[in-house]
From Swiss-Prot:
NCBIfam families: L11_bact. It comes from the Bacteria. Keywords: Methylation, Ribonucleoprotein, Ribosomal protein, RNA-binding, rRNA-binding. Part of the ribosomal stalk of the 50S ribosomal subunit. Interacts with L10 and the large rRNA to form the base of the stalk. L10 forms an elongated spine to which L12 dimers bind in a sequential fashion forming a multimeric L10(L12)X complex. One of its GO terms (biological process) is translation. This is Large ribosomal subunit protein uL11. PANTHER family: 60S RIBOSOMAL PROTEIN L12, LARGE RIBOSOMAL SUBUNIT PROTEIN UL11M. Forms part of the ribosomal stalk which helps the ribosome interact with GTP-bound translation factors. SUPFAM superfamilies: Ribosomal L11/L12e N-terminal domain (SSF54747), Ribosomal protein L11, C-terminal domain (SSF46906). One or more lysine residues are methylated. Belongs to the universal ribosomal protein uL11 family.
Length: 142
């Protein structure tokens, strides 16, 4: 018989930097999960990644207080900032540009992020990522 799922916890945790302080501690503590066990397992799985990379994680809590977690790829905004070399997006998106990004870089991001996106083709994924880039104040060049 399968374990009974009691809930899901969605968090965005920096790679290699999971610790019991907020937001991880309270989110897992509410479900009665072992916080340190998650932190150790997460840090072990993200040890080879660049430290500080934001990693979305979905934690599945079970009735016997055990858990499993699934890591996803970093958010599109992280890839866009890294590709364009900016620290943050434009404060006045649509009027001022914070940086530039090429269609080739957008295609590369779309191919990398494809498993996490809900689109059928790379072209559809590119359209979604271009929208995110415009929202961040990035100029899209040929």
């Amino acid at each position: 018989m399968a374990k009974k799922i009691t809930g899901f916890v969605k968090l965005q945790v920096p790679a290699g930097a999971a610790n019991p302080s907020p937001p991880i501690g309270p989110a897992l503590g509410q479900r009665g999960l072992n916080i340190m066990e998650f932190c150790k397992a997460f840090n072990a799985r993200t040890a080879q990644m660049e430290k500080g990379t934001p990693i979305p994680v979905v934690i599945t809590a079970y009735g016997d207080r055990s858990f499993t977690f699934e890591m996803k790829l970093p958010p599109v905004s992280y890839f866009l900032k890294k590709a364009s070399g900016i620290a943050s997006g434009s404060k006045t998106a649509g009027r001022g540009f914070a940086g530039k990004i090429s269609k080739a870089q957008i295609r590369e991001i779309a191919e990398k992020k494809m498993p996490d996106l809900n689109c059928a083709s790379v072209d559809a994924a590119m359209t979604m990522i271009e929208g995110s880039a415009r929202s961040m104040g990035l100029e899209i060049t040929g």
